[in-house]
């Protein structure tokens, strides 16, 4: 049966421009087996919180699935993956869908646009979605901004996040690092070292900007052992068995305490002497 409200509902969901560019379809709600439906592998959302899916699942059990899932001719989801997951969790075998008459490329583009417009994506999921649209659908930052109703600077800033090391992208996905922090680290040679320090010391964005500024002036890299931050940034956290063996050999040879401080950009070999006489003895041995 044709639902008179579906045209307006889909327009609200996907936008007037999307509707006008789609091929004609009857927009008939059909009931199909849930196992025939496939998630969209290119959708930007990669993290689905179980608690929120469970909450939606309970709501669907109590009230039914009020909004049909939108799929294409291959039964791949265009819009509604959270609802589909919630229905599977609720062990619902058949669900209402609207099948859109789209080819694979059109389906993928609309699915990406629809998901990117959601407010609960992480900034990194949004950034990856922008990148995919730019690389596969010839979007520019200007065109994306116009299509999504976002500022060009927002689009450009998020696209740049894709240049970050994967470990920092993961921190953005986990919300352990904010977009403001991450922007300070783009294209920085030691971004991962700084990111770990920022998280360990709970620095705000302004403090992170100052840290990066001082770094650029070689305040930490030139003399890392002369300040607390430099030491924490550059000192290796892992024990090196070869270095420990060397410490033992040198200590036994000179009969004094010897330590080695190993940094990512170098290190120090330290002889601990009691008095000048012992220092003279060390220097004589070294010569």
From Swiss-Prot:
GO biological process, one term: positive regulation of sporulation resulting in formation of a cellular spore
Pfam families: HTH_ParB, ParB_dimer, ParBc
Superkingdom of the organism of origin: Bacteria
Keywords tagged on the record: Chromosome partition, DNA-binding
Entry keyword Magnesium: no
GO cellular component: chromosome
InterPro entries, per database record: Chromosome_partition/occlusion, HTH_ParB/Spo0J, ParB/RepB/Spo0J, ParB/Sulfiredoxin_dom, ParB/Sulfiredoxin_sf, ParB_dimer_C
Gene3D superfamilies in alphabetical order: 1.10.10.2830, 3.90.1530.30
Transmembrane regions listed in the UniProt entry: none
GO MF annotation: an example: DNA binding
Sequence similarity: Belongs to the ParB family.
Function statement: Involved in chromosome partition. Localize to both poles of the predivisional cell following completion of DNA replication. Binds to the DNA origin of replication.
Protein's name in the database: Probable chromosome-partitioning protein ParB
Species of provenance: Rickettsia bellii (strain RML369-C)
